[in-house]
Amino acid sequence: MNIIPQPLSLKEHQNFYLLSYNTYLVVEGGCTRHIYRQARLLQEAIEKNTGFSLHLTKGEARTGDILISYCENVPDPEYYRLEIDPEGVRIEGTQQSIIYGIQTFIQVLEQSGARLPGLSVEDRPRLPFRGFYHDATRGRVPRLSYLKTLADQMMRYKLNQFQLYI
């Protein structure tokens, strides 16, 4: 499995998880609206990559569902854990780090489709600042739509700083 950037811990298992039309995308009750918006991004990515339009709901997950869980008791504010097994998918982290777990899951989804390999991923950034520097002094100033697309790509690779030099 190729995940960029490479996580601190990635363990592949022999089992797999199969997405289906009966799968729900569940956001745990204690999650904020910010996390719920991130879950919508995951819902769109699942539909784009598999064709399944999963129901997004709050509450408790059933066996076989995808659960996004808020957890404060983590070693680092940007730490997350992703577990994929036959029982379902669990993405755990802080409000700040759940987006990183979602982005990792999307990378797995893009490589595997609806039949996801069993994985255990634990990750946190190695550096506090991970950024992209865009120098537009000798060319055209980028449009806002381009900058938004660039920000989406930065989120995909877990970058947290953007410097635009005009």
Where are these regions (language model features)?
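Short, well-structured alpha-helical patches and their helix-loop capping segments
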Residues: 97, 124, 138-142, 146
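The substrate-binding groove and active-site-proximal loops of carbohydrate-active enzymes
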Residues: 92, 130-144
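Short, polar loop/linker segments at the starts of domains and inter-domain junctions
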Residues: 80-82, 142-150
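Mid-sequence acidic-hydrophobic segments that form the walls
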Residues: 105-108, 112, 135, 153, ...
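Contiguous, structured surface segment used for ligand recognition
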Residues: 1-130
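Conserved residues at the C-terminal ends of beta-strands
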Residues: 28, 135, 165
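Catalytic domains of carbohydrate-active enzymes, especially glycoside hydrolases
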Residues: 146-166
